[in-house]
Amino acid sequence: MTITDNSAGTSDEVGYDILHVVPPQSAPDWIKDSPVRKADDPNGYVDVDPNTLQHTQWPEIFSLGDAGSTPNSKTGAAIRKQAPVLVDNLLAAMEHRRLTARYEGYASCPITTSRKTMLLAEFDYSMQPAPSIPLIDTTHERRDMWYLKRYGLPAMYWNLILKGRA
């Protein structure tokens, strides 16, 4: 694969066994064009403390998921872990209490390695493994992880996550 840096006029050839391409991501224009955005962020995300999810300038503003400036992957797994932190901290702020809930950067990415195997890359802000399934090594490709992606995660999304139960 060739990686080209158009601004520097350079390119490098890089070999790989597995290529995981992440598309460019940014906040919507209405956030990018607002004062809540992080000033030095070209992607225009809402400027939040990465652990409390509270805005760094306006304490009544919280953000999570694809809109927040947390320095982690923008994944469904991340927002699933951010939502309870935001709710706890928002309620604490409304009651003038200290914000004690903390988001540690958990994110997850299911990586399909064949037609019937997958591994589940789970990590935190330090980019260290952060496994969430007890007794199962999700860092190596497994058939049961493929079944999780194919059947378990869609069911979890539609029946639990969207209803605030997971």
Language-model segments: which ranges?
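FAD-site-proximal beta/loop scaffold in flavoenzymes
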Residues: Y16-K81, L91-A92
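Short, electropositive alpha-helical surface patch
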Residues: T75-V85, T117-E122
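Central beta-strand plus flanking loop segment that forms part of the substrate or channel wall
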Residues: D29-I31, A107-T112
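C-terminal auxiliary extensions adjacent to catalytic cores
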Residues: L120-A166
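Conserved beta-strand-loop-beta-strand element in the redox core of flavoprotein oxidoreductases
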Residues: M1-E13
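A structure-centric signal for secondary-structure junctions around beta-strands
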Residues: W58, G105-Y106
